Amino acid sequence: MTGNRLINFALAAVTLAAVTLLWGIPHAFKPAAVQAASLEAPHWGEGGVPQFQIDPDWPKIPSKWKVGFGSAVVGDNKGNVWILSRPRRLPKEDQASAAPPVMEFDQAGNFIQGWGGQSGAGYQWPSNEHGLFVDDDGFVWIEGNADGKSNNPADLPNDNQILKFTNDGKFVMAIGQSGQTGSNSTHILKGATDIFVNTKNNEVYVSDGYGNSRIIVFNANTGAFIRMWGAYGHTPLDTDRRPARAALKQDPWTAVSEVLQQFGSPMHDVKVSNDQLLYAADRGNKRVQVFTPDGKFLTEQFVGPDLEDLQARGLAFSPDPGQRFLYVGGTPDAWILNRRTLEILGTVKTVPKGGPVGQTGTSNIGHLLGVDTNGNLYTAGELSTVFGKTQGAYKYKLTGYSPTIPCCQAPRNISAAAASTGATEATEAP
């Protein structure tokens, strides 16, 4: 080997070592599926990063109604947008004029329909509405997260059900049993948070949630259990069996590798991309983990690890066929990521300039996210003192794309112990 070749080889080795130290093991050695997709993706959002501006006129709530706290918002394949709210969270004097918990609007904000709120044969309507999804066939899926006395304004039996309805609100099916607790059951949930229905394989993915630390999968037609898994594909542990942090404000990315081996509480959202990658929003650990739909861990990204506000609350994809951008909900801002590389490209200011931040009940925004067919972004939550009214969700109109400037911070270099995931296969139905 010549002297020049020796020098080049040494420089390459030093460069590889530096990259490994900067990104941590999971990022330095991405699995082949993610690595291949990354090579195809525009680097740093080549062509620009989406820019948004809040639309104060969306939605147009009928004047006779008051809207409870907005829990979820989602776009459907017809171009309309749905809001799930919590009527029981309204002050008592407003509950007689509460808007229905499920409402559909067009992109201009015009009201189309509303329904829900009452229990019926075979199901209990949630005490505390949480997750919402409209699948490609038009079925509407909701769930609640009341657990005993926690998040239970109506003091009803625990929610712990996924409910499937027709587009106009006729009950179809329930997954789980109301009045039960989930533990690690294959058919009962515990504080589930959101739903995604993958019509390509007829599966329902549930982020479960506040009581359990897992993704759990059911058949979309029968509700039969298929499989489940936890962080890195590990067997999930219940809340009371998870390692505890030493203190409430302990930095969860420093010397807590044992904690990181499980999803934090709550595991708050789940989405599956067009190229069949599953994204899990681990709010408890401020990260997004990526899996195959059968539970094989691929990679992860931490968002806002040094911020005190809640992060990794919700997920949404840009509507282009390649779903180039991944939006990750946070408070008070949402994050814009290159979906295939997980590089952080920028943020969306979800609280208007000069609006209140940190005041109770005024800026609990970004609870869950949605997008419509034109690429506009929506957040569920509340900005009541900004607009002087409650409306459940807010529209951020896509105004164009800006030149790409590297933003924010690189992924944290988590400890070698946490990086050594020891990923396992998902637990499947026998």
Question: Residue locations for each model-derived region?
Answer:
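Eukaryotic scaffold repeat domains enriched in small/polar residues
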Residues: 7-8, 22-430
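Bacterial N-terminal signal peptides
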Residues: 12-24
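N-terminal Sec-pathway targeting helices
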Residues: 2-13
